Amino acid sequence: MKLDLKILDARMRDYLPAYATTGSAGLDLRACLDAPVTLQPGETTLVPTGLAIHLADPGYAALILPRSGLGHKHGIVLGNLVGLIDSDYQGQLMVSTWNRGQTEFVLNPFERLAQLVIVPVVQAQFNIVDEFTESDRGEGGFGSTGRH
């Protein structure tokens, strides 16, 4: 799949999104910063990537997801948990960055911050009904199938 990528900050030409390994599902996104940013515990900031994409095809969307090492080792996760990039969005990719850890975290310019995953999308249409055809599960939810 080929995507249209617009470089909004010329410095990002050296830091294009890339798969870290041949089996990677996510493309690494980097922080397009002029100087280091310090996030205090509990603080959230919006970090630019210096890049924009246009998927164009409504059969696809992109997800911005956290990098597992930053979350596990430093408590750095996404403030909105998952960023959803619609196929018709053409603005800069931004990363809502939240320090849920107990210590301050310094984010350096061009550091890998998040990952971008392209996913297929089905746009559903609704069929209005008065009743559902009964299933084995019915309305059971929130633990109704047990833990083991």
Curated annotation (Swiss-Prot):
SUPFAM superfamilies for this protein? dUTPase-like
Q: Which UniProt keywords apply?
A: Hydrolase, Magnesium, Metal-binding, Nucleotide metabolism
Query: Has UniProt tagged this entry with the keyword rRNA processing?
Result: no
* Disulfide-linked positions: none
Q: Which reaction does it catalyse?
A: dUTP + H2O = dUMP + diphosphate + H(+)
Q: What cofactor requirement does the entry state? A: Mg(2+)
**Magnesium is among the record's keywords:** yes
- Under Enzyme Commission nomenclature, its number is 3.6.1.23
Sequence positions that bind substrate: R67, S68, G69, N80, L84, I85, D86, M94
- Which pathway is it part of? Pyrimidine metabolism; dUMP biosynthesis; dUMP from dCTP (dUTP route): step 2/2
A GO BP term here is:
dUMP biosynthetic process
Any one GO molecular-function label of the UniProt entry: magnesium ion binding
Please give the family membership noted in the entry.
Answer: Belongs to the dUTPase family.
General function of this protein: This enzyme is involved in nucleotide metabolism: it produces dUMP, the immediate precursor of thymidine nucleotides and it decreases the intracellular concentration of dUTP so that uracil cannot be incorporated into DNA.
The entry's protein name is Deoxyuridine 5'-triphosphate nucleotidohydrolase
| Source species | Burkholderia cenocepacia (strain ATCC BAA-245 / DSM 16553 / LMG 16656 / NCTC 13227 / J2315 / CF5610)
Question: Its gene?
Answer: dut
